[in-house]
Amino acid sequence: MNAADRMGARVALLLLLVLGSPQSGVHGEEGLDFPEYDGVDRVINVNAKNYKNVFKKYEVLALLYHEPPEDDKASQRQFEMEELILELAAQVLEDKGVGFGLVDSEKDAAVAKKLGLTEEDSIYVFKEDEVIEYDGEFSADTLVEFLLDVLEDPVELIEGERELQAFENIEDEIKLIGYFKNKDSEHYKAFKEAAEEFHPYIPFFATFDSKVAKKLTLKLNEIDFYEAFMEEPVTIPDKPNSEEEIVNFVEEHRRSTLRKLKPESMYETWEDDMDGIHIVAFAEEADPDGYEFLEILKSVAQDNTDNPDLSIIWIDPDDFPLLVPYWEKTFDIDLSAPQIGVVNVTDADSVWMEMDDEEDLPSAEELEDWLEDVLEGEINTEDDDDEDDDDDDDD
């Protein structure tokens, strides 16, 4: 295959990977043109000779730390696909001052050590003095969205009624808000420094407006922490708080009773298991049954928010269409209906709640009873293994 053919194949592959197959006869209209890779190489091979200049060139730099691709065709193709994802993201974000690079774990081991790169096949994002490990889906759109968030300030200011309403509408992730005198306040600066530690995974908000603070029942230099899907906040004690106090509080409370699996942080969430297991709930929010089940989950979570042993991961299948067939096959479940079960993160063994009536969802009380059995160990994936062994013996 010559260079021109190879380039054509790479472009076609990227479009299929990122944008899907184009419909025959459908052309992009002005204002709705999806980006197509223009063939310009923007992703830099970062090494000992050029890494200092590369860091000086970009406000934000995303580096893929990778092991050398194997010689087989599948490994080579996989690496090309990953490189093409970075190329499209680099093209889209070129005017934003975002650069992209590759660091080979063998050829450039010395550079990797200097930069603190430790986990292969991970993307590390450098912004000023902060290093952020990207733990999300390896796709151009998700990566671009994440990096646009990185470019934003770590603290968003609430200055009026509309911004307050937008803040209150955020329910599916942890959020913090503090009330301070002004930007020069030493307590606001401590809050901002703490925000940088969690940016962009956890949103931090602040207000200098006494009217906004009154509606939020915030006192001066007070910080409220909202757990995901919880209506009432918890106030960080002993105001005014230092950066260390804020960071420690967030670290201690960041695992919500109910948390949503999101493309931009899916691996971080999945790796934060409870003794090797996850309680996983599948529910399509756009589906009537899924919405109803999600409301039941919220109610149960709100009633049990003080239980540190309970954490449920909610997955909306609509967010991960490529994973739906895998989940259905691996867990032997039908994701066209809501499901909740226990998953072993080591071997993907699972056991799922049986619904007495397929047309009726469990009540909050029934779900709480089931969760209590899970937490007490009466329902676990080992029991499922024992049943499989019994079936084998019968054979």
Swiss-Prot record:
Signal peptide positions (record): 1-28
Membrane topology, record value: Peripheral membrane protein
Function: Calsequestrin is a high-capacity, moderate affinity, calcium-binding protein and thus acts as an internal calcium store in muscle. Calcium ions are bound by clusters of acidic residues at the protein surface, often at the interface between subunits. Can bind around 80 Ca(2+) ions. Regulates the release of lumenal Ca(2+) via the calcium release channel RYR1; this plays an important role in triggering muscle contraction. Negatively regulates store-operated Ca(2+) entry (SOCE) activity.
GO MF annotations in UniProt: calcium ion binding; magnesium ion binding; metal ion binding; potassium ion binding; protein homodimerization activity
UniProt key word Endoplasmic reticulum: yes
Modified residues (Phosphotyrosine): Y37
Glycosylation site residues: N344
Phosphothreonine PTM sites in chain numbering: T118
Domain of life: Eukaryota
Keywords: Calcium, Endoplasmic reticulum, Glycoprotein, Membrane, Metal-binding, Mitochondrion, Muscle protein, Phosphoprotein, Sarcoplasmic reticulum, Signal
Assembly: Monomer; increases in response to a depletion of intracellular calcium. Homodimer. Homotetramer and homopolymer. Can form linear homooligomers. Ca(2+) ions promote oligomerization. Interacts (via C-terminal end and preferentially with the monomeric form) with STIM1; this interaction increases in response to a depletion of intracellular calcium, decreases both STIM1 aggregation and clustering, interaction of STIM1 with ORAI1 and store-operated Ca(2+) entry (SOCE) activity. Interacts with ASPH and TRDN.
Record GO cellular component, one term: sarcoplasmic reticulum membrane
Subcellular location as annotated: Endoplasmic reticulum; Sarcoplasmic reticulum; Sarcoplasmic reticulum lumen; Mitochondrion matrix
Main localization category: endoplasmic reticulum
Protein name as annotated: Calsequestrin-1
Region named Disordered: 376-395
PTM annotation, UniProt: N-glycosylated.
GO biological process, one term: positive regulation of store-operated calcium channel activity
Modified residues (Phosphoserine): S75, S210
Keyword Lipid metabolism on entry: no
Tissue-level expression: Detected in skeletal muscle (at protein level). Detected in skeletal muscle.
Lineage: Eukaryota, Metazoa, Chordata, Craniata, Vertebrata
Gene3D superfamilies reported for this sequence: Glutaredoxin
Entry-linked CDD domains: PDI_b'_Calsequestrin_C, PDI_b_Calsequestrin_middle, PDI_b_Calsequestrin_N
InterPro entries: Calsequestrin, Calsequestrin_C, Calsequestrin_CS, Calsequestrin_middle_dom, Calsequestrin_N, Thioredoxin-like_sf
